[in-house]
């Protein structure tokens, strides 16, 4: 599942952090 952070970053359940 992909969750959007308040900053708009996508947090992956795999533990990876992707900044969009």
Curated annotation (Swiss-Prot):
InterPro entries, per database record: Prot_inh_Kunz-lg
GO molecular function: serine-type endopeptidase inhibitor activity
Domain of life per record: Eukaryota
UniProt KW keywords: Disulfide bond, Protease inhibitor, Serine protease inhibitor
Stretch forming the signal peptide: none
Subunit description: Heterodimer of an 'A' and a 'B' chain linked by a disulfide bond.
Family: Belongs to the protease inhibitor I3 (leguminous Kunitz-type inhibitor) family.
Function: Inhibits trypsin and alpha-chymotrypsin.
Protein name: Trypsin inhibitor A chain
